Amino acid sequence: MVTISYILEIGEHELLKKGFIKIPPALHHRRYALLWGGLLISVTGSQMQLWALFWHIRTLSDQPIAVSGIGLVRVVPVLIFSLLAGVAADRYNRRSLIIVTQTTMMLEALALGLLTLWGHIQIWHIYLLTGIQAVAGAFDLPARQSLVPNLITRPEDLSSAFSMNSIAQDLGAVVGPGLSGLVISYFGQYEVYILNAVSFLAVLLALFLMGPIPQQIKSDAQVTGSGTLGSIKEGIQYILSKPIILSSMVLDFWATFFSSANTLLPFVARDILNVGAIQYGWLSASQSIGGVIADFILSQRAKIRRQGTLLFAAVTLFGIATVLFGISRVFWLTMLALAGVGAADAVSTILRNTIRQLQTPDYIRGRMTGVVQIFFSGGPQLGEIESGLVAQAFGTPIAIISGGIGCVIAVALVALRWPELRKYNGDEPILAGSKNPAAA
């Protein structure tokens, strides 16, 4: 057994040599490592801003539905633009698209900071600018997710890459909320938004350093008119023809729809646990602390077996931990429940992304991700609206507990409807490197 004293005695380099710790396989790919480093910094800033927005609106309004409005303005652009964003990720250079989207989000954060600094900020400003950021994000995610397999030359390292993506998200989400609480307490709300604007420069620098990225592009279709509609139809038909991908999307949507209660966390912190901004920051980071632990364990694995069984177990734990979060009236128990939510969510996210990307050819990967984005972004963001409405009518604890129960029921129904997802092992034929049949 490896103890802490043993680790301190022999040191990190010896642990690497003895095989207890190894550099994740994905980080051996230079271009991916550049992107990962930039994302780690940028996600920290974005998480600072996200949780600061919830807190900011809570200071401007005492109505839960006001905070839930953030979920609405974040989900509407996803529903409207995701299909077009998927086409764009297949039609245009993905690296160039990400440069445009990251720059747009940087300017949005800067505008939030300046409006807050000048004392002109109102709730509608927050909604409008968050909506603009959501439009950019709707185009950013399909391009960025689809770019990852272009940066990884060995398909067996793809699960490690998505584990590292999740580590970047969760490490940023650990540090970001904590920093957000500290910055708000000691410097001011506007400083959070300015710091987020600066953090986007890390991704832009990484994209510049990695240079051009090879990509399959279907050149015979047009960007407008029937070409675009035909491309969208092709992406949807592909998903409908692949039960593994379709079922993972349905599971993702309903689980996150019921168990999304992040917008209620300020009300749990202030009205149930009676804690301030710093403790709120730690509660916000708890999910990601659990996520980082799960991410690190999975990142060490180049190949994961029994992926379907593990996926269903993770989503079930996600629902159970959400119920515990709703029941808890103690600060440390709430942190523990949220850590369980984060760990389960990290495992399920890594597995879903790996399954989808490996089972989708490069030429259609952007469109697949665009359709999937409607489900995995729409689920939690619509869930934030649902939880706000239920909390308004029946109280915050009931909203959270009922959501966790709904998640567990959704897992059971998907397992019965699509047994092939539960039986998915991870050694099925890989389609990620398949050529565009239209170009053959």
Model region roles, listed by residue range:
Residues G38, F54, Q145, P149, ...:
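Interfacial helix-capping/hinge residues at the ends of transmembrane alpha-helices
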Residues P64-I65, P155-N165, A277, D362-V371:
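Loop-to-transmembrane helix entry/capping segments in MFS-fold secondary transporters
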Residues L40, L72, V76, T103, ...:
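Transmembrane alpha-helical cores of Major Facilitator Superfamily
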Residues I123-A134, S160-K218, I278, L283-A285, ...:
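Hydrophobic alpha-helical transmembrane segments
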